[in-house]
Regions:
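N-terminal entry/capping and adjacent linker segments that precede and initiate structured domains
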Residues: 1-314
Length: 314
């Protein structure tokens, strides 16, 4: 499992189950902002993008296989410079291809602009979302990659009802093989309690909805998991992770279902936050040696990205 520090462009690879450090890798390319975010990782390829301030601009994107020491910078998106976008990275199982989806996030009214990059064509093209026009995409995942589950990328979005000026939460899916959008309902019960933050993740290959709630006395994460994909009735509350008065940020899940969190620890002198791996079955915590706020993705070695234009070996 690789993670990237926000202070130094270094990728650290750790064991998935224990988070014990294996080795560090210097990232062989630069970003204008000096900070990188892991957009996703599949079949040995990491997709990284630049971060400007607190938003992902997605104007500089790289595909990188550290195992074979090759990378390529993606061509400029056809939509050009955008203030804020959300990015998804996926493996195209039908054509053995890789896809990057770039969606503009508008702070006013939708619709959003959408474009798709494929590695085989090495080009971007615009696509239309044939759903309701008044859907507004959110970028609530922050450290978490946009989850790829059952061949689809998943975003939190809002359906703006014009007459009532009310925004209803929903999940929007992009199916990579057919390039079609559809929407999923939120799990029953997940919206009954007001939440400070809602994000999506892949938990052991299943779609998970994570709600973060804070009150005067405690902070907690509640994780809902869809046991049968596309069947809302199969969603169930898997567990609740209470953190007392400790502020915690969900960084990501490991392949075996452990949760990596970043929590404020005022007792530490040299760092404001500490990173903890939580066993979601026993709720036991294990400290990690991650020192700074990071983006995390799962990783498995491969020989992908051997061919193609604008490939750089180092």
């Amino acid at each position: 499992m690789p993670w990237i520090t926000s202070l130094r462009q270094i990728c650290t690879v750790t064991f998935d189950g224990t988070f014990d450090r294996i080795f560090d890798i210097g990232i062989p390319f630069d970003f204008p902002s000096g900070c990188a975010k892991i957009i996703g990782s599949y079949n040995g390829l990491l997709c990284l993008a630049d971060i400007e301030r607190i938003t992902t601009s997605g104007n500089v994107i790289y595909l990188w296989n550290p195992n074979i020491r090759k990378f390529k910078r993606l061509p400029k998106p056809c939509l050009g410079q955008l203030d804020s976008v959300t990015l998804g990275f996926a493996y195209h199982s039908k054509y053995y291809d890789y896809t990057v989806v770039r969606i503009s996030i508008s702070h006013s009214m939708p619709p959003s602009e959408i474009e798709v990059y494929t590695l085989s064509s090495d080009s971007w093209r615009r696509i239309e979302m044939l759903l309701r026009s008044n859907i507004k995409f959110y970028d609530n995942n922050y450290f978490l990659p946009i989850p790829l589950v059952s061949g689809a990328l998943h975003w939190m979005a809002g359906f703006i009802e014009e007459e009532e000026k009310h925004c209803s939460e929903m999940i929007v899916c992009f199916y990579v093989n057919c390039e079609k959008f559809r929407n999923l309902e939120m799990p029953d019960g997940s919206m009954t309690v007001p939440s400070f933050q809602i994000c999506l993740a892949s938990f052991k290959g299943k779609l998970a909805v994570i709600t973060y709630r804070e009150s005067e006395h405690y902070y907690q994460y509640t994780i809902w998991v869809m046991r049968e994909y596309g069947v809302n009735e199969s969603s169930h509350k898997l567990f609740v992770l209470p953190f007392g008065r400790r502020v915690a940020i969900c960084i990501g899940f490991t392949e075996n279902g452990s949760l990596l969190i970043c929590g404020r620890n005022d007792q530490l002198e040299n760092k404001k936050y500490k990173f903890v791996l939580v066993d979601t079955e026993t709720l036991l915590e294990k400290d990690s040696d991650i020192q700074h706020a990071s983006c995390v993705g799962t990783f498995m070695e491969s020989l992908a990205l051997l061919d193609g234009a604008n490939m750089v070996s180092y």
